């Protein structure tokens, strides 16, 4: 005996509407709400390392995620703290949030901003870059770094966010010149810096290794003719005055090779590029003379 299946008209209409809705979801890339949390792979920091003789502690300044435990992540108008899980080589990281994460609502790209460090009192605002005045200790040098990824498109199938440094990196290599057989024990200080956002006008550098010194600064321009590098060696104080404006841009590294002479500082070369070394320029500083104090010490301006 045959049985016939009768479907009421209203039920048939519901089936038809459901089919249309599924087709529309597939067509506009929408996803079910609350099922696809936003998890991002963080990359982009340069893998340029500190010199081999330096301590092995790693940080973002070395292109390393080991010292970063969380970042502020902005999507739309909301900002949330995301946990950082570094890769085994610490050169990339996974950004995720266990409770109340962002969710993908479609397969379309999303716009994300993220930064570290952030202000716990107000995580919604990216803090201004403010570096330490005394960076002679490794921890203070490393903690002066600021990183961010601003208004970046993140793809659903490849959710990657590229970070960059918000600071400029200055590296100074000293060499003994006329009147010196060694430059060991020198103190190197960057001077004539901008005080914007409460930044120091002078920064004591970190002795990274041997005769190499480093410091991180906020982006700024040091005017031509102003003292920029101060070297204290023995009883003498020496200055290097650039002949052109020094434009310190975020994410760039500026490497100066400076020869210390009894009559002043000679610039042997200046390399300007990304956080790792790049192309640049070279030249010499003028000898502007020196003065002798009553105690027998002398200051050379060059």
Model-derived features with residue positions:
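Sec-dependent N-terminal signal peptides
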Residues: 6-12
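Sec-type signal peptide cleavage vicinity
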Residues: 2-6, 17-302
């Amino acid at each position: 005996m045959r049985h016939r299946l009768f479907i009421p008209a209203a039920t048939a209409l519901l089936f038809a509407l459901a089919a249309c809705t599924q087709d529309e979801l597939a067509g506009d890339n929408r996803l079910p709400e609350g099922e696809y949390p936003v998890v991002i792979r963080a990359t982009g920091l340069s893998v340029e390392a500190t010199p081999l003789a330096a301590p092995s502690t790693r940080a973002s300044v070395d292109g390393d995620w080991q010292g970063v435990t969380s970042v502020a992540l902005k999507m739309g108008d909301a900002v949330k703290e995301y946990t950082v899980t570094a890769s085994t080589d610490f050169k990339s990281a996974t950004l995720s949030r266990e409770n109340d994460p962002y969710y993908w609502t479609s397969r379309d790209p999303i716009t994300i901003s993220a930064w570290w460090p952030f202000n716990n009192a107000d995580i919604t605002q990216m803090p201004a870059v403010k570096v330490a005045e005394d960076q002679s200790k490794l921890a203070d040098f490393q903690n002066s770094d600021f990183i961010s990824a601003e208004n970046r498109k993140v793809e659903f199938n490849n959710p990657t966010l590229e970070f960059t440094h918000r600071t400029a990196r200055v590296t100074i290599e000293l060499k003994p010149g006329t009147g010196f057989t060694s430059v060991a024990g020198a103190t190197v200080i960057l001077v004539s810096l901008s005080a914007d956002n409460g930044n120091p006008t002078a920064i004591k550098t970190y002795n990274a290794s041997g005769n190499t010194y480093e410091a991180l600064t906020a982006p700024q321009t040091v005017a031509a003719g102003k003292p920029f590098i101060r070297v204290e060696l023995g009883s003498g104080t020496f200055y290097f005055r650039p002949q052109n404006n020094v434009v310190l841009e975020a994410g760039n590294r500026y490497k100066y090779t400076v020869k210390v002479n009894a009559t002043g500082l000679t610039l042997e070369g200046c390399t300007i590029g990304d956080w790792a070394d790049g192309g640049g320029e070279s030249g010499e500083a003028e000898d502007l003379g020196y003065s002798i104090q009553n105690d027998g010490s002398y200051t050379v301006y060059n």
